[in-house]
Every structure is written in structure tokens, then in C-alpha cells.
């Protein structure tokens, strides 16, 4: 493999501290978005409302959403939301975002330390950038969910296991920390956190036919610690929520979602398709890596010896690919393959499926690449696995700019640009220009130097720069993200009703009082208005107001205020 980059310890501050460089750059690019964006109604606003209710009622282990038991998630993330609320006096999107961003940095840092020992600064930065800009991983860094935190604990668990198994960097505390990390993954998100690390370890030990390892790594000590911590948690839930809440937690939410999901039910093959676009823009490279890793190994240079005496420390102990282009699979490569395959198979067997559930496998998908690269050497398809997406982004960028500048008119896009005028603002255009230029430069390096790392690094950097530039119009986008903007127009002291809104029940997190939602039944709203003698604020979608006579009649009684796709009016009874 050609190496035109500086080695660790040489060069400037960026090459001496490649991971810190990537993390600081990522933080700077994402900071404005995290600081200014609104909360989404589906999950984020619900978490805030649940936290408010828990603080008001003094609940710590059993949570409720408007009086109804909410046993969908364990308490750790709600504790974080509650703590931030107490510390800042309000719900801070920036503060809560840190509990997605920092775990992402920890995950990437661990994978780099685990896999990239002795590698060039450019390779390390490229792999870190790839991890952080896989589309679903990047999205999970920005949204307020517990998935990234759970992923961090899963990575910590598997890293701890591998240290114990290989003896490389093993610590006396590892036998205790392995079950602790597994429990914390469970305590963050639920059953996937409990199942993924032991399943990956079990499949790996089975492949290696290390039957004694089951007792050593997944024996009574491991399960005893997990069971003890889980019993303590369940006991606290029982005391606070009672048997009905326990049944909801253990039966409905756990077994129900796995066997016969009441939400997010998808076919078995769903993840086989979803993982391709979730790993974009590195899908081709990583899919090719996975296939190359599965292909039979031929002409191994070094005979592997049986038993634990064999070196098991992964790519840092293998010979240079140029000297030995077809070595046998390292234990680390086998572990990563077992983790990816077993996790996707496990998730596919569950009835409830969402693309974001795949997040824990993404670090292993990305860092499988340098392991395979060391074993088989750099190939042309690896460079073009990155280059094809660079070309796609370049073509899209060059095609979009004339449209956004108004030089080219496309009738099909006129309505969209009219509905979303912020798409024509300078920060959006600048972001597209930055992304396009970065990929043009990446293509040049691909053709001129025939390397994969610089184009990959530029592709990721271009995405971050585009997000940074576009963040200047987040305040204009916020009305389309959440309800904060329209709720800021709600007057004090009125009752609030909603109709034709998606998940409006948690608007109380903004206005400090409960609302009445009339779903898709404006006739019930009309009856309620007629029967009430109190001032009433009505919130709905502007598109519905324009087409439904009942709403038009109600809104004609007051001043109509607009924000993004929503509008409201206040009806005062005289």
C-alpha cells in the first residue's frame, strides 16, 4: 500500500494529534446546529415532557407521559434530561446534544486505539471521519436519543472482552467492567444493549471453538453481576411503579416489541437494505470490504497455531500488506465479522425495526476496512468505492447550483422552493459549493495519487462544512422541525387545542400547560368551541386551514398567526 502521509509523531500539530483534530473540527461544524435547532415532536419533545412530569411528581425509576406509564426506555437517559433541566433551568438542546456527540467521539477514539496502532495520521483521520459521517451515525450524533450512548457502552464491552481474550492491554478490572458495560448498555436503551455484546462474544468463541471461553467470559461472574444490577433496578421500579409498571416494562415493551411489534413492524430483510443507505457515502467501500473479508483466505504467509498462544492482537501485529498481501484472518477481523453478522441477524429476527437500531454495528463496519486492507493490500475498488460517491456529490452540486442561482428553471422544483424559501439563501448555496469543491479536490487526489484516504477525508470534511454553512439558516428551518416557533406565539392564560398535528400532546414542554388534541376531527373542535366560555388558542396546519370549511369559520373569528407550515388563532369569548 502506498503511504504518502506523515507517520505518527512527525509533522505539524494536526498529524501529531489526528483524532483531536477530527473531534475539534467536528464539534466546531456541528455546534451551531446543536445550539439553534428546535426539538422534534416525535421523540425529543416527548422525552422533555416525560422528564418534566418526573421532576414534578418526584419519580426516578418509573416514568409517565401525561399520566400513562412510559416503560419503553430505561431510566439513564431520562436522568440525563432531568439533570440538564435542573442545572440550566430549561431544556437545552446544546447540553443534551453533548450526550450524543461525546459518546460518538468516545466510540471513534476507542476504535482508533483498538485498530489503528502504528497507522499514519492521514489513515486515522480518514477512518475517524468516515465513522462520524456515515449518514445514520451523523444523524444520531445530532438528534437527542439514547442510541449513541448505548453504542458507546457496547463498544466498551467488546473492547474490554478483546483485551481479556488477547491479553493486549488487559487490566485486572476487565472481568468486572465487562458485565458493567453490558448492564449500562441495557440501562441506557434496553434489550439490544444486553444481547449484542454477549451474542457477539458467543459467536466469536464458537467460531474459534474456544469452549472454555464461555465460562471465562460469559460465566457465572459476568451474568451474576448483570443479574445483580438488573435486580436492583427492577426492585426500585417495583417499589415506585408497582406490578403493573413491571409488566409493561418486561412483557409489553420487551417481549411485545421483539415478537409481535405494535410499532415499527418491518419484514425480515429490512436491515439488509437499510444498512446500505445508512452507511452512505461509504456504502460501496464498506460493502466491498465485508465481501472481501468473507472470501476464502488463500496462500496464507504465516501458519496460525492453535490455542491462546497465538498472537491475537489484530492488525497492529500483522506484517505489512506489501510483503504479505494474503495473510490469514486475524482474531480481530473474525470478532468484527461475528459482531456485524450476529447483530444484523438478531435485529432482523425482531419484529420492531428502525434503521437507527443499526447504529451499534457501524463502527465495526467502518473499522473492518483497515483490517482487511492490511490483509489483502490496497485495491482499485477501494479507491473507487469512495470516488464514486465523490463523483455523485460533485455532479449533484454542479447541477444544483444553476437551479439555486435561478439560471435554470425546473417547474417541478418551483413549488418546493416556494414552500421552503430558505433553500435559496446564501448559507445553503455556500454549503453546496464547499461540498462540491471538497469532492472535486478528492477526485483529483484519487486520480493523481491513487490513494483512498485523502478523498475519504475530503468527502467527510465537505459534509461537515456543508452542515456548518447551512446551520446559519437553522432558525428559518426550525418551524419545519418542531413546534417551538408556533408555540412561542401562544398567548398566556388561554386553553390550547390542536387539530391535524403530528404528536402534539407534548407541546406542554413549551407552553407549560396541557393541551387538548382533536386529532383529525375538526367537527369535535367546533362543538368544544361552542360549549366553552374560555379563550381558546387553536393550532393547526396551514394546508388544512386552506381546505377545511369548519376550520376556516373558526379562524375567521380571530387574528391568524403563521409559522412555517403551522398557524394559530385565539378565539376570545365576549
Positions of PLM-derived features:
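Membrane-integral, polyisoprenol-dependent glycosyltransferases
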Residues: 2-382, 476, 558, 563-566
Amino acid at each position: 500500500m502506498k503511504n504518502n502521509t506523515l507517520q505518527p509523531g512527525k509533522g505539524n500539530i494536526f498529524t501529531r494529534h489526528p483524532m483531536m483534530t477530527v473531534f475539534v473540527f467536528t464539534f466546531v461544524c456541528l455546534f451551531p446546529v446543536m445550539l439553534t435547532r428546535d426539538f422534534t415532536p416525535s421523540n425529543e419533545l416527548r422525552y422533555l415532557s416525560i422528564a418534566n412530569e418526573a421532576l414534578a411528581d418526584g419519580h426516578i425509576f418509573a416514568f409517565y407521559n401525561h399520566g400513562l406509564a412510559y416503560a419503553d426506555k430505561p431510566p439513564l437517559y431520562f436522568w440525563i434530561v432531568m439533570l440538564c433541566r435542573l442545572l440550566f433551568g430549561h431544556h437545552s438542546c446544546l447540553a443534551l446534544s453533548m450526550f450524543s456527540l461525546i459518546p460518538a467521539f468516545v466510540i471513534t477514539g476507542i476504535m482508533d486505539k483498538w485498530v489503528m496502532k502504528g497507522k499514519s495520521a492521514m489513515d486515522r483521520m480518514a477512518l475517524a471521519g468516515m465513522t462520524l459521517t456515515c449518514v445514520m451515525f451523523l444523524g444520531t450524533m445530532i438528534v437527542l436519543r439514547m442510541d449513541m450512548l448505548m453504542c458507546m457502552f457496547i463498544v466498551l464491552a467488546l473492547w474490554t472482552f478483546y483485551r481479556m481474550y488477547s491479553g493486549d492491554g488487559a487490566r485486572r478490572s476487565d472481568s468486572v467492567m465487562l458485565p458493567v458495560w453490558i448492564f449500562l448498555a441495557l440501562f441506557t436503551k434496553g434489550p439490544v444493549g444486553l444481547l449484542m455484546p454477549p451474542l457477539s462474544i458467543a459467536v466469536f468463541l464458537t467460531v474459534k471453538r474456544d469452549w472454555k471461553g464461555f465460562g471465562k467470559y460469559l460465566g457465572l461472574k459476568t451474568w451474576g453481576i448483570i443479574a445483580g444490577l438488573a435486580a436492583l433496578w427492577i426492585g426500585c421500579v417495583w417499589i415506585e411503579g408497582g406490578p403493573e409498571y413491571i409488566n409493561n416494562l418486561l412483557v409489553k415493551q420487551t417481549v411485545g416489541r421483539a415478537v409481535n411489534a405494535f410499532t415499527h413492524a418491518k419484514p425480515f430483510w429490512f436491515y439488509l437494505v437499510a444498512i446500505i443507505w445508512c452507511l452512505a457515502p461509504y456504502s460501496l467501500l464498506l460493502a466491498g470490504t465485508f465481501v472481501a473479508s468473507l472470501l476464502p483466505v488463500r496462500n496464507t504467509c504465516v501458519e496460525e497455531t492453535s490455542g491462546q498462544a497465538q498472537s491475537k492482537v489484530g492488525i497492529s501485529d500483522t506484517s505489512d500488506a506489501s510483503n504479505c498481501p494474503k495473510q490469514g484472518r486475524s482474531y480481530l477481523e473474525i470478532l468484527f465479522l461475528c459482531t456485524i453478522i450476529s447483530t444484523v441477524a438478531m435485529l432482523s429476527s425482531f419484529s420492531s425495526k428502525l434503521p437507527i437500531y443499526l447504529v451499534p454495528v457501524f463502527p465495526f463496519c467502518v473499522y473492518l476496512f483497515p483490517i482487511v486492507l492490511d490483509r489483502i493490500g490496497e485495491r482499485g475498488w477501494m479507491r473507487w468505492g469512495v470516488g464514486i460517491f465523490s463523483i455523485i456529490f460533485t455532479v449533484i452540486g454542479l447541477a444544483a447550483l444553476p437551479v439555486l442561482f435561478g439560471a435554470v428553471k425546473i417547474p417541478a422544483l418551483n413549488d418546493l422552493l416556494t414552500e421552503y424559501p430558505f433553500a435559496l439563501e446564501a448559507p445553503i448555496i455556500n454549503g453546496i459549493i464547499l461540498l462540491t469543491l471538497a469532492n472535486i479536490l478528492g477526485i483529483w487526489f484519487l486520480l493523481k495519487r491513487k490513494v483512498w484516504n485523502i478523498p475519504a477525508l475530503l468527502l467527510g470534511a465537505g459534509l461537515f462544512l456543508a452542515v456548518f454553512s447551512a446551520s446559519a439558516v437553522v432558525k428559518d428551518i426550525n418551524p419545519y422541525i418542531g413546534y417551538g416557533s408556533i408555540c412561542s406565539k401562544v398567548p398566556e392564560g388561554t386553553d390550547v387545542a390542536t387539530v391535524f398535528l403530528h404528536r402534539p400532546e407534548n407541546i406542554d414542554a413549551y407552553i407549560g400547560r396541557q393541551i387538548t388534541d382533536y386529532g383529525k376531527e375538526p367537527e369535535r373542535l367546533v362543538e368544544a368551541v361552542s360549549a366553552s366560555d374560555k379563550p381558546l388558542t387553536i393550532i393547526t396546519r396551514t394546508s388544512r386551514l386552506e381546505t377545511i370549511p369548519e376550520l376556516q369559520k373558526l379562524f375567521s373569528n380571530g387574528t391568524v398567526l403563521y409559522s412555517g407550515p403551522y398557524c394559530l388563532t385565539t378565539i376570545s369569548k365576549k
